């Protein structure tokens, strides 16, 4: 198994009132279940759901806090970085292999001009060229 989340399932866990109150102050009420559903899709190591979410807003509203919570939940199964870098840097795509979630908490709209690689990753349509440096390949062999 390549994906192992750093959390323990607790069926008797209390209602996450602090988290829900935070979301209530950040999102419209009808958007909260959408975010929760999206996070649930991200827990599944498949891209059949073809999921990508953009949360737009002004600075200092708490969007980055969602990323911090997701980082704690997903651990090493999440990559934070630049969506634009996926299109610009041919080696950045290789870093997304076996990653459940990629978060760009400060995305520039210019990053969405070249969406062919992002679309290929989200939809799993077409071939994605993953390039590794020789050093990375050595680490993979020795690990």
Task: Report the location of each language-model feature.
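P-loop NTPase catalytic core of nucleic-acid-dependent motor ATPases
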Residues: 1-100
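Conserved nucleotide-sensing/catalytic segment adjacent to the nucleotide-binding pocket
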Residues: 94-131
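Conserved small/polar residues in nucleotide/adenosyl-binding loops
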Residues: 132-133, 137
């Amino acid at each position: 198994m390549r994906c192992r989340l750093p959390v323990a399932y607790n069926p008797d866990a209390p209602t996450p009132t602090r988290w829900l109150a935070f979301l209530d102050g950040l999102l419209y009420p009808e958007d909260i279940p959408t975010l929760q559903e999206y996070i649930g899709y991200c827990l599944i190591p498949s891209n059949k759901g073809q999921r990508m979410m953009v949360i737009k807003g002004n600075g200092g509203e708490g969007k980055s806090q969602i990323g911090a919570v997701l980082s704690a939940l997903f651990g090493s199964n999440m990559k934070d970085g630049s969506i634009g870098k996926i299109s610009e840097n041919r080696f950045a795509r290789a870093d997304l292999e076996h990653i459940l979630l990629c978060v760009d908490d400060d995305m520039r709209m210019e990053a969405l001009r070249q969406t062919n690689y992002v679309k290929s990753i989200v939809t799993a349509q077409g071939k994605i060229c993953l390039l590794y440096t020789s050093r990375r390949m050595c680490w993979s062999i020795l690990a």
